[in-house]
Amino acid sequence: MATLFIADLHLCVEEPAITAGFLRFLAGEARKADALYILGDLFEAWIGDDDPNPLHHQMAAAIKAVSDSGVPCYFIHGNRDFLLGKRFARESGMTLLPEEKVLELYGRRVLIMHGDTLCTDDAGYQAFRAKVHKPWLQTLFLALPLFVRKRIAARMRANSKEANSSKSLAIMDVNQNAVVSAMEKHQVQWLIHGHTHRPAVHELIANQQTAFRVVLGAWHTEGSMVKVTADDVELIHFPF
């Protein structure tokens, strides 16, 4: 058996091939797992659990079917879907996790997260993140009419795209000191995260020993998952 990790699907109605690929994954590989962890940015945008978008209901039903089959499903918020709430979690059968979670997997101590908090060189993004994660601001936003939230979200995505176009790739990647600090804080040898869309397995030193950072890929033209078993930790890419 294996525990599976995925992230950065950025599901939206404009990308039906990714949706179809995810549905096949849920109906196939996911059903064989000990557990499924989704490490953020499952959706391209999330403006509230009350959004009647048919895609959201379709995904909730598909994930719920995996959960009902006996495979526990867990979710860590990403920077795109940090407003995903308890209602959708209940409808999909997912358990919401904190932004950093330590797992004991087949004798390994593994830290999981979305990964955006590691990009500390991007001061502009970190300031924005701190602002939009304020509970009072989220409550205020979610109280707005749906059409207003849609307009605000569209403007924010446009602003983000424009800002990122002028940033260096190095700034938008993780900060090595932040990585080591997180791993040493939690006393782990393994870290699995997404966000950067740069799939790789990195070897480093943390806690005075060899450690590993595994970065999930985004689902653009193919699927990406990390498969953890008693024998191995694999970063796997597969066709939709």
UniProtKB/Swiss-Prot annotation:
What domain of life?
Bacteria
InterPro entries the UniProt entry points to: Calcineurin-like_PHP_ApaH, LpxH-like, Metallo-depent_PP-like, UDP-diacylglucosamine_Hdrlase
Sorted alphabetically, the keyword list is: Cell inner membrane, Cell membrane, Hydrolase, Lipid A biosynthesis, Lipid biosynthesis, Lipid metabolism, Manganese, Membrane, Metal-binding
**What GO terms are given for molecular function?**
manganese ion binding; UDP-2,3-diacylglucosamine hydrolase activity
Q: Where, subcellularly, is it found? A: Cell inner membrane
CC annotations in GO: cytoplasm; extrinsic component of plasma membrane
Residues the entry annotates as binding Mn(2+) 1: 8, 10, 41, 197
Function text: Hydrolyzes the pyrophosphate bond of UDP-2,3-diacylglucosamine to yield 2,3-diacylglucosamine 1-phosphate (lipid X) and UMP by catalyzing the attack of water at the alpha-P atom. Involved in the biosynthesis of lipid A, a phosphorylated glycolipid that anchors the lipopolysaccharide to the outer membrane of the cell.
| Name of the molecule in the record | UDP-2,3-diacylglucosamine hydrolase
What gene does this protein come from? Answer: lpxH
